[in-house]
Amino acid sequence: MMRSHYCGQLNESLDGQEVTLCGWVHRRRDHGGVIFLDVRDREGLAQVVFDPDRAETFAKADRVRSEFVVKITGKVRLRPEGARNPNMASGSIEVLGYELEVLNQAETPPFPLDEYSDVGEETRLRYRFIDLRRPEMAAKLKLRARITSSIRRYLDDNGFLDVETPILGRPTPEGARDYLVPSRTYPGHFFALPQSPQLFKQLLMVAGFDRYYQIAKCFRDEDLRADRQPEFTQIDIETSFLDESDIIGITEKMVRQLFKEVLDVEFDEFPHMPFEEAMRRYGSDKPDLRIPLELVDVADQLKEVEFKVFSGPANDPKGRVAALRVPGAASMPRSQIDDYTKFVGIYGAKGLAYIKVNERAKGVEGLQSPIVKFIPEANLNVILDRVGAVDGDIVFFGADKAKIVCDALGALRIKVGHDLKLLTREWAPMWVVDFPMFEENDDGSLSALHHPFTSPKCTPAELEANPGAALSRAYDMVLNGTELGGGSIRIHDKSMQQAVFRVLGIDEAEQEEKFGFLLDALKYGAPPHGGLAFGLDRLVMLMTGASSIREVIAFPKTQSAGDVMTQAPGSVDGKALRELHIRLREQPKAE
């Protein structure tokens, strides 16, 4: 081995010992004829001192520059009092260097590694191999490794088997677009990269493996957001002969143990909340319980008002009128309210009504709002009492189709909570349960809210008679308003699976073409089974406090699903395309 210790491992117990370090020159300083090198490796920094007494080594140290790769041998010694650095793990010691070998030189990096805040993300991704040298980036990937190690250990200890499933599969309708891979040996046919190992893990349960897990790479060709990538990693889990409460218990214990082991954070038992309650109170199926603001329904008080913006949705069976009280925010300037009005417009809201509660004892005169003139005072008082409004509060209103109100006020609740620093705690884990089986599309057709293999809480006949009322045996783990993982009890009965397909408009021919292998497996003694998949990237993002999952993936794609470092995706030569039986169509030239 070239090194005896990592830089970050040096401490006072090594005082007087000889060590050999290998790494990069993080910083070079010349003070009063003495040269100081901060040497960096994966584990941290160490200060190495070179004095002129060793002329040859001193001359070498004088020639090194930032990011040179070096091997240094020297003796550990305690730093003098007053020269210790509490910000470094090895800040109480230094190494007196007496041998220095330059293993490789380096050009000046495109950006400084300790002053990176003004560097654009595209530049950082273009030189990701340099960006990852920054200690804060290395720390995130090291924590990611600890997280996966902890999870594997827990699942191994609880009887789960790590089984790999295929990357090349067949296209199936799972919601997002597939990444397609053309087949050379089957002209005109395509593999699909997996959006999840869903069907294969169910088949492993049919095969009798009982408890399965996999740290699985998954692919979805969809528009990217801050928490999405075209390729991402799932902690995929499936079990047989366990019900919802069993699976929830096993996976919750895993997450609680993970946070204790990695962050020394202890969680109480996670609360459970039905989907309907989450949407009603928080406007979201992944509520952030750290924010003490709730949506309150007030439609019953606004059905008879002449203000159509309120009375229309209040009398619409698919409409909703809800209020959101923000304590102590009546002094909010109009410019801020205008900004929030634009913000809710992103979610389809046509405006943002409000009432500032200045002095309730004065009745309407104590309220400041352009809408109070449209609402009878008795109804106003009921609304203000219902939301718990007191002097100094502001109450926002949303009135539209229920989905728009939930989306707009739910997002506003989060934004206001962060803007006004209303968060009451650092962590808020929970379970959301009792999801609907289906959601209605704009054209009136139905889509599976989770996926079409989720078991409903009813019989096949009841499902087909009233699919809109059917609840599923699904459950999502939510942390700080982010869905960490989603799962369900699966359908293990062929007739039930076919009933779900029929509700989704998948006829028998399409069932056989796309899911024949699954229906075939369900005929041969499929056990009751269920599972859950966690998004590893999101989990690491939350645990590290990163702003995006791109910060916790070694080599992520950009927002437009490209790789600026390798220039992927790239073009393919004509010979390769001919072997794949593919001919490219010329794109029309832009005028």
UniProtKB/Swiss-Prot annotation:
The main place the protein resides is cytoplasm
* Site (Important for tRNA non-discrimination): residue numbering on this chain: H31, G82
Binding locations of L-aspartate: E174, R220, H450, R490
Pfam families attached to this UniProt entry: GAD, tRNA-synt_2, tRNA_anti-codon
What SUPFAM superfamilies has UniProt attached to this entry? Class II aaRS and biotin synthetases, GAD domain-like, Nucleic acid-binding proteins
Top-level division of the source organism's lineage? Bacteria
Where's it found, cell-wise? Cytoplasm
Query: Which InterPro entries does the entry mention?
Result: Aa-tRNA-synt_II (IPR004364), aa-tRNA-synth_II (IPR006195), aa-tRNA-synth_II/BPL/LPL (IPR045864), Asp-tRNA-ligase_1 (IPR004524), Asp-tRNA-ligase_1_N (IPR047089), Asp/Asn-tRNA-synth_IIb (IPR002312), AspRS_core (IPR047090), GAD-like_sf (IPR004115)
| Biological processes annotated in GO | aspartyl-tRNA aminoacylation
> What's the stated role of this polypeptide?
Aspartyl-tRNA synthetase with relaxed tRNA specificity since it is able to aspartylate not only its cognate tRNA(Asp) but also tRNA(Asn). Is 1.5 times more efficient at aminoacylating E.coli tRNA(Asp) over tRNA(Asn). Reaction proceeds in two steps: L-aspartate is first activated by ATP to form Asp-AMP and then transferred to the acceptor end of tRNA(Asp/Asn).
**UniProt-listed NCBIfam families:** aspS_bact, PRK00476.1
Q: Any idea what this protein is called?
A: Aspartate--tRNA(Asp/Asn) ligase
Q: What organism does the UniProt record list as the source?
A: Pseudomonas aeruginosa (strain ATCC 15692 / DSM 22644 / CIP 104116 / JCM 14847 / LMG 12228 / 1C / PRS 101 / PAO1)
